Amino acid sequence: MTKVHPKFPSTCEESLCDSKAAVVLTVWKKSLLFNCDGFTVYNANGELVFRVDNYMNCPRDNIVLMDASGFPLLSIRRKKLSLGDCWMVYDGETERDPIFTARKNVSIISNRKSLAWVSAKKTVLYEIEGSYGQRSCKILDERRNKKKTAEIKRKETVIGGVAFGKDVYKLIVESEMEPRVAMALTIILDQMFRSS
């Protein structure tokens, strides 16, 4: 299948990872391509940083997170024959050795605020708490005493505080986490809680 890759002078990914301060991204749940489902992500300067373009007739169990120029950064795939909702994330477009796995929390006994657990090689890395339907989530680092490493918040106008709705929201990523990983987790949450 042919892919469309717009030409941009430079990618914003390097500047995002070099930052020591929190990175604020605006996530728009809309593809830039006609007849596609996906995401468009901008930095604080309004520059395109990430994009996801899924054609309407393609299955949603294989998603590719790309940079602004269309280079594949991470592949997100639903785990087949899994008891729960489980997603595996790979580097680029590879299908070997997942970087991490995200599993939806289905236990009614455990913490009700917990949405999902993220692990790598049987070690829990992150816990995601909050409500994706309300666009109010925190990604907590389990290795650093549940320190907040990223947050999803509703985006509001500067004047008047009017919310944009559920399709436009902020992703605030602390320096301890890669922005591409935080965006991959946001995409997984959208798949897990699509009807919310």
From Swiss-Prot:
Disulphides: none
Pfam families with a match to the protein in the record: LOR
Gene3D superfamilies: LURP1-related (2.40.160.200)
InterPro entries with a match to the protein in the record: LOR, LOR_sf, Tubby-like_C
Domain of life: Eukaryota
Protein task: Might be related to the phospholipid scramblase and tubby-like superfamily of membrane tethered transcription factors.
Name of the protein: Protein LURP-one-related 8
